[in-house]
Amino acid sequence: MARLLFRLLVESNTPSPAIDNSTAALNSDLVVILAALLCALICVLGLIAVSRCVWLRRLAAGNRTVSGSQTQSPQPPVAAANKGLKKKVLQSLPKLTFSPESPESEKFAECAICLAEFSAGDELRVLPQCGHGFHVACIDTWLGSHSSCPSCRQILVVARCHKCGGLPGSSSSGLESEPEIEIRIKQGEDDPNSFLP
């Protein structure tokens, strides 16, 4: 009789397999829920960091325009590159007729806008700030909505100073002039595919 009672007591204290499965399922559900909450927390923190960066940049840009002092860190006007040129300024840019025999033709191989090679008799417009050349129709369309070179993004028209009418960064005396450096590269010398037949 004592053995029977001992056996019943031991069996009642031993957990059944059904109870083990339910606790394991509960633990795995808890792990999935905690992982989802952790991912959500990381996403929220990332969005907060991005919005804070945007807010700080807007605040810094607002302070720069309000104070009016751009002598500390002169930066090129980014908004000016998206306006486009006036027709008067556009017509003042130099044009030339492409001739394969001319020494100037070495600089111009193809139009970076339409990707067509220049042929004899094509009219090209050369941008004075960077020296890049394009078909007249291509670059006129581009410059109708942009104020920068499509190849190097050099801004073509720099805003003049409202007080003195001079260009930014230029000295009023004109005594100090930086020497111009011209670098010429022979055709095929800097071509990464020059090893190909």
From Swiss-Prot:
Main location: membrane
UniProt catalytic activity: S-ubiquitinyl-[E2 ubiquitin-conjugating enzyme]-L-cysteine + [acceptor protein]-L-lysine = [E2 ubiquitin-conjugating enzyme]-L-cysteine + N(6)-ubiquitinyl-[acceptor protein]-L-lysine
Signal peptide location: none
Cellular component GO terms, alphabetical: plasma membrane
Residue ranges the record marks as coiled coil: none
Residue spans, zinc finger RING-type: 111-153
UniProt region (Disordered), positions on chain: 168-197
InterPro entries documented for this protein: RING-type_E3_ligase_ATL, Znf_RING, Znf_RING/FYVE/PHD
Record's note on what induces expression: Up-regulated by chitin.
Pathway(s) this gene product operates in, as recorded in its UniProt entry: Protein modification; protein ubiquitination
Keywords from the named record: Membrane, Metal-binding, Plant defense, Transferase, Transmembrane, Transmembrane helix, Ubl conjugation pathway, Zinc, Zinc-finger
Membrane topology: Single-pass membrane protein
Pfam family, one: zf-RING_2
Subcellular compartments: Membrane
Known EC number: 2.3.2.27
TM annotation in the entry: 30-50
Gene3D superfamilies associated with the record: Zinc/RING finger domain, C3HC4 (zinc finger)
Single biological process term from Gene Ontology: defense response
GO molecular function: ubiquitin protein ligase activity; zinc ion binding
Cross-referenced SMART domains: RING
Domains: entry comment: The RING-type zinc finger domain mediates binding to an E2 ubiquitin-conjugating enzyme.
Annotated family: Belongs to the RING-type zinc finger family. ATL subfamily.
PANTHER family: RING-H2 FINGER PROTEIN ATL61-RELATED-RELATED (PTHR45798), RING-H2 FINGER PROTEIN ATL8-RELATED (PTHR45798:SF101)
Function: May be involved in the early steps of the plant defense signaling pathway.
Name of the protein described by the UniProt record: RING-H2 finger protein ATL80
